[in-house]
Amino acid sequence: MIIDVHVHVFEEKMWSKKFLDGVYEVKRKTLTPEQFEKYSLEATPDMLIRDMDAAGVDVSVCLPIDFAFMTRQEPEISIWKANEYVAEAQAKFPDRLIGFVGVDPQRPDAIELLEKGIKDWGLKGVKIFPGMFYPTDERVQHFFRKANEFDLPILFHQGSDPHPFLIKYGNPIYLDELSLKYPNVKAIAAHTARGWNDLLAELMVFRVDKIWTDISGLQYEYTSSKWHFFTNLRYFIDRVPNAILMGSDWPFVKNPPQPSHKEWIQILRDLSLPKVFLDMGMQQFSDEEKNKILGNNAQKLLGL
């Protein structure tokens, strides 16, 4: 079973104007005119299922993103409706899609939305984007106390952040305290906490069955620095082979020069260290290791 633990489904009106303007400004500079003409911040469940079928992905975890409270500009479609949209996607494709609650824990009604999502809509976890707060801040502990009661995975964006968010809040060191303070919280550090990869791996060694990571975003390393891609992935497998989860960050990471969704899955299926790494004494990726990344680890974590 191939499981992608990091995808997003949304309509454009679920993003604030400030966010949309920023995205389109960046894309206008980085995409060709032909690519920009086709670019859209629209990623429906049906579009996702088509890409999953083409790539051979069996199950994807859909993560709502709540930027709006931090940027003080709410989108036309509220975060409540964005979460309900994910719940409806899960209901429409119950064997293919798993929905998480996505909410900024600083919101006054964050716990209300969490309870609605888990109890009434049947969502299976939580997505947190700590772009302007530390997960250990006292003002959000009431949220994590409630989340701890549900005994569900919480996926945290980790590592570098887009403007206007601050990278310091994505340091995985703060997951260490949370993992000890809330014994039922299963923390997933997204993107191998890019920028803090070694620190995250060290934390995971000492917090087995408490902290996991997903490899969404490593597509950038694959295209820009094969050296970093292979050494980073090999290092995590050597240290925490049962805690690495496959992620794609669909639909955000699929435009050239990054591999498409289908190409990314194929890269991981065919994962093979070039000879230069083997000559240095590094171990070749085994079929067992590749299968753990592609889905076996996620299957155990999610109870599938």
Task: Pin down the residues of each PLM region.
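H/E-rich (His + Asp/Glu) clusters that bind or coordinate divalent metals
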Residues: 186, 193-304
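Short, well-ordered coil/turn segments that N-cap beta-strands
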Residues: 1, 56-59, 93-98, 120-125, ...
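Active-site gating/metal-coordination segments in enzymes
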Residues: 63-170, 212-214, 219-221
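Active-site neighborhood of phospho(di)ester-bond hydrolases with catalytic His/Asp-centered motifs
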Residues: 2-5, 63, 100-102, 127, ...
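Histidine-centered catalytic micro-motifs
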Residues: 2-12, 154-159, 189-192
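Conserved, mostly hydrophobic/aromatic
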Residues: 6, 52, 86, 99, ...
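An N-terminally biased module of ancient metal coordination in phosphate/nucleic-acid-related enzymes
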Residues: 1-77
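Distinct, well-ordered alpha-helical segments
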Residues: 108-118, 137-143, 164-181, 195-206, ...
